[in-house]
Amino acid sequence: VPMALAARMEKEHFQINLWTGASTGDEEDGALARANGIKFRMPYQTNKDMRNAINSGKIDYCDLHLSESAQLARYGFLGGKIDVAIVEACAITEEGNIIPTTSMGNSASYVETADVVIVEVNTTQPMELEGMHDVYVPLDPPNRLPIPIVKPNDRIGTPYIPCTPDKIKFIVPCDIPDHTRALGEIDENSRKMSQNFIELLHKEVAAGRMPKNLLPLQSGVGAVANAVISGFVDSDLKDLTVFTEVIQDGMFDLIDAGKLSFASGTALSPSPEGLERFYKNIKEYRKHIVLRPQEVANSPEIARRIGIIAMNTAIECDIYGNVNSTHIMGSKMMNGIGGSGDFARNAYLTVFFTVSTAKGGAISSIVP
């Protein structure tokens, strides 16, 4: 649907407001940006063409903490209601309920609030994905209740996105596979960061401030974050749990090594090789993974309750401990804050990783 929409935009020259869960593939963010078809974008992106259009002022961009984006959409604070929700699915039940694929994001809230729902049934996604989701949308004030999760493997919702047949106006078959990005090789700097961090965790356990299997881990996205989490494979730590936003290759490594008992997230974002490995071993991985709406996966309430260990990457940080995760040279948007603010401000232990310099040593990552 987004690719067909981009082709129409190039001919008819109109624009839309685009709300997503987080970043999307080039088939959406890239195609629509190149067609000059986006007026407003929120809450996170990683596409080069989208980023360039945002930084040049062609696209208005709202950089949000990801835990807040769904509720702000429901409240109507982002410029009105949702007209059309496009959701990828591997199946639709007879009752109209939607079985998501490898990402939950904000889909449940968008389906709930949209006037029209379009479902893309992706035939490249395995039916074994059914049952891997736990869909729970919190009530809005004044009726909001605590989100009843006290450990990563708790299930509190449904394995589908609730919907009704009358709301689904179009069903579009799709055979485009997930196009994920390659992760960088684990270099010596990343390996050393991981070793230093694991040494710190051992000291915390020895001091009695953490249990032997630690507290639930949260890991950001990207090559450095993936390298750090992969370092746990060679440690003597075991029976680990994860409560995070995005699940990458390193967590598959931990499951394969018997070190990770359970991982909760909102999306899978592995490398192409990691995605192939997931599909090949999905019957085993589904025992250890649950995907939730990002309003729950990124919930500051839950992060603080279960006491996560937050591990994220930084563009730069200052000597007072302030961290910049969003802007280059103070004014150019990179991707966005994403979920790092949700987790870092509410974790039991907060850690940011960065190499000491950027641009081949020309720019310091540590600033006054």
Residue spans for each PLM region:
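Conserved alpha/beta enzyme-core scaffold
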Residues: V1-P368
